[in-house]
């Protein structure tokens, strides 16, 4: 199995994705030519805070303004992501009013993520529609590059199973649940492995709000 051509959805296909795609296709063709059974697989990141960021920006400022062309729409989604990050980024010497506005925007974005995570029908539908816009562009780019995927895996398909695994790790004492104290679910890697020279490696496996990581 060769895994490649897997950009995040709601972001336009760019030169970095092209490099990865061409390299992956070259490796797939070489293994196939050498006589090996070859499966071309893509694992797009179609979930996470970056995806929710675009949904929030669209819903709040740009709903119904999307262009109709496949590639124009994909590039437009990327612009929404950039604009959203400008609004959400803390500015140097920002005024109290600007701080309050930025924090309000951040709270709205987090609330949308919470709603998605809780299965809110309207947020899930918006996610499905915009996700398909991004995938339409990706499929067309792959067609242009003469790349044909055999299987598609999506991050959203492993979101719920991964939460179940986290709960299992907590139950087994491998992960520490610090959410009651305002923290996240973490694994203290050095402590669990009995390493003494390095004591600072900690892996966050679930955010404090219960959402998963990339």
Label each PLM-derived region with a short phrase:
Residues 1-214:
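NTP-dependent nucleotidyl-transfer catalytic core
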């Amino acid at each position: 199995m060769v895994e490649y051509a897997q950009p995040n959805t709601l972001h336009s296909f760019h030169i970095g994705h092209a490099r990865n795609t061409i390299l992956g296709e070259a490796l797939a063709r070489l293994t196939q030519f050498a006589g090996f059974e070859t499966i071309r697989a893509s694992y797009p990141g179609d979930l996470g805070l970056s995806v929710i960021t675009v949904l929030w920006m669209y819903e709040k400022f740009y709903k119904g303004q999307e262009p109709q062309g496949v590639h124009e729409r994909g590039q437009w989604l990327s612009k929404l992501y950039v604009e959203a990050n400008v609004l959400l980024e803390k500015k140097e010497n920002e005024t109290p009013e600007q701080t309050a506005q930025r924090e309000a925007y951040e709270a709205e974005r987090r609330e949308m993520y919470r709603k998605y995570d809780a299965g809110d029908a309207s947020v899930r539908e918006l996610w499905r529609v915009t996700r398909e816009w991004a995938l339409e562009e990706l499929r067309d780019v792959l067609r242009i590059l003469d790349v044909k995927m055999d299987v598609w895996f999506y991050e959203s398909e492993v979101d719920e199973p991964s939460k179940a695994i986290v709960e299992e790790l907590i139950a087994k004492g491998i992960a520490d649940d610090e959410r009651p104290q305002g923290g996240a679910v973490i694994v203290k890697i050095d402590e669990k492995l009995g390493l003494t020279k390095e004591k600072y490696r900690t892996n966050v496996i679930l955010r404090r709000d219960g959402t998963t990581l990339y």
